[in-house]
């Protein structure tokens, strides 16, 4: 198994542990969700991802602890790319916290999601994740490293939600042909 995939899953578990008190508001999306749905199936997807993506549903998000405090307490730090919602675990593996665009307050002129009292830099507003907060199921997520015994129950976006998110992502990147490879 690819070492990068093992590290990315470990970072996902680090984030789920950090955000345990926000458990009901967190949904695994992106490649990690696809891997969880496909398991060991022989499918035509790249079986390596360098990051983990988490959708945050602010409708049931507790005010305490603040997302940024929970992440920092677990050793995460903001990615220097200055993109809101971009975090790195202590090993430098990225985890992105994203809020569905229509669930973020304020105008669309900001990349950082507006979900007071949480920091505007804690999460990023993202078009296309709305379906993930509706189409998801509770799944058991385990480490891929045989020496890591952690297991978490977390919401994972369903196939329809993942497809909708991918279509939006591709549409956003039509003006950036060099970024259409994922």
What are these regions (language model features)?
Residues 1-182:
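Compositionally biased terminal segments of proteins
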